[in-house]
Structure formats: C-alpha cells, structure tokens
Amino acid sequence: MLQVAIAQKKFPCYYLENFRCMDGQMISSYLDIAQLNIDPQLIAKELKQLEQYIAASALPSVRWEYQIPELGEGGACSLFGYLQDEPFKLTDHVSATSQNEQKLANLQNIVNYIEQQTQVDWYGIYQAVDTAEGPQLLKLAYQGAPSRPLFPLTEAFAAGSNNVQVALSKRGRVINNVENYLAQGGEYYTCDPKVKAETCLPLFNEQHECVGIIDAEAFSNDFFDSRTLAVLVACCIKIPHFLV
C-alpha cells in the first residue's frame, strides 16, 4: 500500500493537562495523517474512558460466521434485503487460534462500546488482508444489518467505495449528508438505503501504514458531531492492538 511521508505535529504534555503525553502524541499523529480537525483533548478524554471500559468489561463471544447480502451483477453492489444461503466464514481468512479469538473478542467489545456510547446504527471494523483475489478489506467485527464481508483494495473499486478510498488515501471521511455528497459526485458504496450519514476512518500501525478502517453509519443527517467523532477516533487508536 502507498506510503506517505508525514510531518508530525507534536502537542506538548501540558496541552493535554492530566492525560499522558504518549497518548497526546498518538492522537496528534493520527489527526495529522488522517487530516481530521477534532479537539485532541476531547479524544484523550474518550481514550481514557475506553481503556477503563476495556479493563473492566468481560469479553463477548466471537462471531466466526455471519450472514451476508447477495451481490449484484459483477459483484459491485449488495442487493439489500437479499441474503446468501450460506454464511460467510471468517475462518476462511483468519485462523481460529486462541490468540486470534481473544483479539476478535476485544474488537467485538469495542464495537459494543461504540454502540453504547454513540447509538450509531451500523459500525464495523475491517482489516487489510491478502486474499486469493488480491488485497482486500476484511470485516472482522460489526453490529447492525448484514453487509458485504470483503472490499477489493483497488483504485477501480475506490471509484465507488468510500471504505476503499479511505484505506488507499489514509484520509478520514465524515459525510453528514449522504444525499448531498452523492449529488456532488462523491464516491459512495450504497448498502443500506436508510443510511443518511457515514464516517469512515483509517487504522494505522506504528509505522503509520494504513492497516484497515472503521465504518460507522447513521440513519439521520448530521449525526457525527465532535463528541461522536472523538469516540470513533479514540477507538481507532486502540483497535490496531487487536488486529489479527
């Protein structure tokens, strides 16, 4: 995947008051790379709350299989409301080891946290993986309606996919009015026609390479305010620790 040189902007320790300087550096780096304008102090507060939740909560069960929609001609679009007979098996792409099971359980725990904190209508975590068909985004954990499990990481698919565009560009996208965004010619992959707003954010490893994305969808316009975005970014900083 394309690598980009990043000029990092460091926030001094006192800028985040009672929060750790390391967290402040991670937050500032993330915002710089993803090109997002969100209050770093608010993200630091949400990150601290997330870490407290992870430490105190019991891990949920892992969903190794899930239903997926039928795909339209050429496999480009989901046929909303029509499900395939056979469930998608995550084990076709992820080994069912105890270590991977614990990581996936932690990811599902974060998904549950997002739902509790934001009441978002759909949320998913995707990891960039190599498949027989080439590099793709693989859905590891989610909540909401059935959706496609894999997105090809190609420039051609990015022309109609917000998820792939974010993964390839490493830039976050916040769309608080999908209808207006489409009318202006924006790239968008429509799965659920009820979706009115969407935020898609990249996930980075320690080398600042994009290793996946998160996707959040809401059934109302202007859903993603500063606090909701801070929760999402806090989780994006934590999620890479649990990728498989």
Question: What is each model feature region?
Answer:
Residues 165-169, 194, 206, 240-243:
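Feature detects long, helix-prone N-terminal segments enriched in hydrophobes
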Residues 197-205:
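A short, aliphatic-rich beta-strand micro-motif
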Residues 2-142:
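Intrinsically disordered, low-complexity terminal regulatory regions
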Residues 117, 190-195:
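Short loop/turn motifs at secondary-structure junctions and domain boundaries
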Residues 121, 126-186:
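Regulatory sensory and allosteric helical modules in signal-transduction proteins
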